[in-house]
Regions:
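Conserved non-cysteine loop/helix-boundary elements of the Radical SAM core domain that shape
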Residues: 1-48, 55-76
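Homeobox/homeodomain signature
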Residues: 2, 9, 77, 82, ...
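Solvent-exposed, non-transmembrane amphipathic alpha-helical segments
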Residues: 8, 24, 36-39, 43, ...
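Glycine- and acidic
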Residues: 21-25, 51-55, 141, 170-175
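Flexible glycine/acidic-rich beta-alpha junction loops that bind and position SAM and/or redox cofactors
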Residues: 22-27, 56-65, 79-121, 126
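A structural motif corresponding to the C-terminal end of an alpha-helix
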Residues: 38-50, 76-81, 130-131, 135-145
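Short acidic (Asp/Glu) and glycine-rich catalytic loops that position anionic groups and cofactors
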Residues: 47-53, 69-70, 110-116, 134
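Radical SAM enzyme core and accessory elements
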Residues: 98-100, 104-191
Length: 191
């Protein structure tokens, strides 16, 4: 990592996908939640910005895992490093996906949608699918309105807490401290 920084590397985009080890195992990512935490620490220590990407909505997503993602990004001071759209992305299962080799996936997908080029699926908790749609809408509206990543994250975290039936305190002040802008790509859909 120090060599990356010394040679001018400003940031690293990493396809983390999930902080849930059972999901990471199904996706065959070859890393764990603990590995991600170590990488975050190494990046902060060397001064290279980490821009993790995620696919937070999978057939195995729970409200608890959604809340955990927001809590960890806040705790790790990664709010400004994550494009808001990354917090609403749904797993796509195209033809030929290795996921289709899993019995549990074959049982949960619908017939192939030739127009969308995917096998559609639904979460066992319809509220999780509704939350994914809501977070995508918040991200799109925030992009259109030029809201900061921090302000958008706060809206998305609030929506997630409400969807999980958690009490949300009304505050006039921001729950997140301001932070200098981090370098990032102008196309936030990388995953």
């Amino acid at each position: 990592m120090p060599i990356l920084r010394e040679t001018g590397c400003l940031f690293i985009v990493s396809a983390v996908e999930s902080l849930d080890d059972s999901v990471l195992d199904r996706l065959d990512k070859n890393h764990t939640r603990a590995d991600f935490f170590r990488v975050v620490e190494n990046c902060f220590r060397t001064g290279v910005t980490l821009q993790p990407t995620f696919v937070p909505f999978t057939p195995w997503t729970t409200m608890e895992s959604c809340l955990d993602l927001f809590e960890q990004l806040h705790r790790l001071d990664l709010v400004e490093a994550v494009a808001p759209i990354q917090l609403g992305i749904r797993l796509l299962i195209p033809a030929g996906s290795k996921l289709l080799e899993l019995d549990e996936v074959r049982k949960l997908v619908g017939p192939f949608d030739a127009k969308a080029l995917v096998y559609p699926w639904k979460n066992s908790n319809p509220a999780v699918d509704t939350l994914s749609d809501e977070l995508q809408e918040i991200a799109a509206a925030s992009e259109h309105l030029k809201r900061s990543r921090k302000a958008t994250f706060e809206r998305m975290w609030r929506a997630t807490k409400l969807a999980a039936d958690q009490i949300v305190e009304e505050k006039s002040a921001s729950v997140l401290p301001s932070r200098a802008a981090v370098p990032f790509l102008n196309e936030p859909w990388y995953c």
